[in-house]
Design a protein with these regions (language model features):
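Membrane-embedded architecture of ER/inner-membrane glycosylation machinery
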Residues: 2-10, 187-191, 269, 304-563
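Membrane-integral, polyisoprenol-dependent glycosyltransferases
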Residues: 2-364, 547-555
Length: 563
């Protein structure tokens, strides 16, 4: 195994070598993630569930028990709820125009922190240019862009994983006999483990642990692990994660352990959960899409990675990627964001291949010409498909084409065409620069303009707007029948209830100021129950939309009791 000092790596331009690089990557991330952060309504289902549970914590003052209305939500640890509650409080509370966005702030900060940490790891062990290119590539990744805009766990988990892997790298990369790690560094490693556990359970342990096993086998020595001070370090991780675990176990009478481990984790390991099953290899098949636009450069980097497989920095990245990737592929339940914690290492390898001055075309960086061209063609097809999806989604609802969606699609296609043309000519660095800069425009138009402008998917905000227009002075309790998505709770509040058409009719009979929202297969039951109770309902308006969580169109009508 060879060991190259990071100072020997290609350095790149002056701004890449200087601390200015961190400011540039931060600004790049903000330019990518801010569009749409406030404009996209609450997304079903996970984001809305997380945010609603956090809202209820703030309403009740109970920051131990996790609930979605009256139902205990014990599948995930508490960390992200605390972060969302703190962010919303610091932001001055919810925004009445779009309540969800303050709950997204921890995801934004997690994504920004992850790309900055990726830059730091790359600069330290692969060189300034590789670190900069890798961090920019990770930032522009389609999957991270989606997670940075959603009030979920995955973007902040990514930060915890990257921080832990930075500590692991500092312990393993130096040769035997190196000076002990500074106290702050090994404490940071174990703190990242503890925070990662508190955010999403054992994922951070799996990624760091499997990487540590591979690195130990690679070096045939265990002594490097002592540099992480495992015994006091484990106590630090436990001090972060254990108090809440004990509190919720007592509060739930052990239900958290049985539901999170037995009901959630074991179910995912044993079989496909919630119709999210896929065979092994699914993540590999998804990679060209969800790592876009960087997937072009990651795939073209494969020969470079093979040639440099004995480089310690490359071994570190491969240990980060391969064992956990195989583990994720082996689990029947598959969702695209599961492999996000491995993407920083992929981005760093792609950045290192780009920065290698000896790795130029026409040799295609080690690919035979037909192989490199096949990769470029695949990448072009993905770009064309992404633009087509934006255009196909644009007219959802009224059938009219969307100018914003069309602009976003053409921006994606322009980035695809320009990047492919330069890559085909062998100018990979120029292609990367164009693609990454162009992604700010293309993804900004997509997330900042095209998606918020859609009508059909955003059913709950339109219901809320219709009700306000008809009853601006206020209304009584709201019951929704035929549409049970949690985004409705974000729109109408914790007191809104889901039920049957008969429940909706009874509510109108009991409360003259109540509102019933009825649609789907509950309309007939609602009308039958009204007739039986001799109650007359007055329609306030109708909202037609597309329930993307179920993949079907729906029509909902708002009612109040007729005077």
């Amino acid at each position: 195994v060879t060991d190259f000092d990071h100072q020997d790596r290609p350095a790149g331009a002056w701004f890449v070598r200087s601390p200015v690089a961190y400011a540039l990557i931060l600004l790049f991330g903000l330019a990518l993630y801010l569009p749409g952060l406030r404009g996209i309504p609450a997304v079903d289902r996970d984001e809305s569930r997380f945010a609603q549970a956090t809202r209820q914590m703030r309403e009740t003052g109970d920051y131990v028990d996790i609930r979605l209305q009256d139902e205990a939500r014990l599948k995930k640890p508490i960390g992200i709820y605390w972060l969302q509650a703190a962010a919303t409080s610091l932001a001055g509370g919810e925004d009445t125009a779009n309540p969800i966005w303050t709950y997204r702030l921890p995801s934004l900060l997690g994504a920004l922190g992850a790309i900055l940490m990726t830059l730091a790891i790359g600069r330290r062990w692969l060189g300034a240019e590789a670190g900069f290119a890798g961090a920019a590539m990770l930032a522009a990744t389609l999957l991270l862009g989606m997670e940075a805009r959603q009030a979920k766990t995955d973007a902040f988990l990514l930060l915890a994983v990257v921080a832990a892997m930075a500590g692991l790298a500092e312990a393993w990369m130096p040769p035997p006999g190196a000076a002990p790690l500074p106290r702050w560094l090994w404490i940071s490693f174990w703190a990242a483990i503890g925070v990662g556990i508190l955010v999403k359970g054992p994922i951070v342990l799996m990624v760091a642990g499997l990487a540590a096993i591979v690195l130990t086998v690679s070096d045939r020595r265990f002594s490097w692990l002592n540099r992480l001070r495992p015994w006091p370090g484990i106590l630090i991780a436990l001090a972060i994660a254990l108090p809440w675990l004990i509190a919720i176990t007592i509060s739930s009478h052990g239900a958290f352990i049985t539901q999170s481990l037995g009901g959630d984790m074991v179910a995912k390991l044993a079989g496909a959960k919630e119709s999210h099953g896929a065979p092994p290899g699914a993540y590999l098949a998804m990679f060209p899409v969800i790592f876009w636009p960087g997937s072009l450069f990651a795939l073209l980097a494969l020969p470079w990675v093979w040639r440099n497989r004995r480089d310690r920095a490359v071994i570190l990245c491969l240990a980060w990627i391969i064992p956990s990737w195989l583990a994720f592929e082996a689990v029947p339940t598959k969702l695209p964001h599961y492999v996000l914690p491995l993407y920083p290492a992929i981005a760093l390898l792609a950045g290192a291949a780009l920065s290698d001055r000896l790795n130029t075309l026409p040799s295609a960086g080690g690919w035979r010409p037909w192989g490199a061209r096949a990769v470029i063609v695949l990448w072009v097809l993905v770009g064309l498909a992404l633009g087509a999806v934006v255009i196909a989604a644009a007219p959802l609802g009224d059938g009219r084409p969307s100018v914003r969606g069309t602009l976003a699609a053409f921006a994606i296609w322009a980035v695809t065409a320009g990047g492919a043309w330069l890559a085909w000519r062998g100018e990979r660095r120029q292609a990367a620069g164009l693609v990454l800069a162009g992604s700010v425009v293309a993804l900004g138009l997509t997330f900042g303009m095209a998606i918020p402008a859609l009508d059909a998917p955003w059913i709950a905000p339109r219901l809320k707007e219709t009700l306000f227009q008809k009853m601006p002075a206020g209304h009584g309790p709201v019951l929704i029948a035929g549409y049970a998505e949690p985004s409705a709770l974000i729109a109408f509040g914790t007191d809104a209830r889901f039920g049957s058409g008969a429940d909706a009719a009874r509510l109108l009979g009991d409360d003259g100021n109540a509102v019933a929202i009825v649609g789907g297969d509950q309309a007939d039951a609602f009308k039958a129950a009204l007739d039986e109770a001799h109650t007359t309902a007055e329609p306030l308006g109708t909202v037609a939309g597309f329930n993307y969580a179920k993949g079907k169109r729906i029509v909902l009508t708002l009612y109040r009791r007729a005077p």
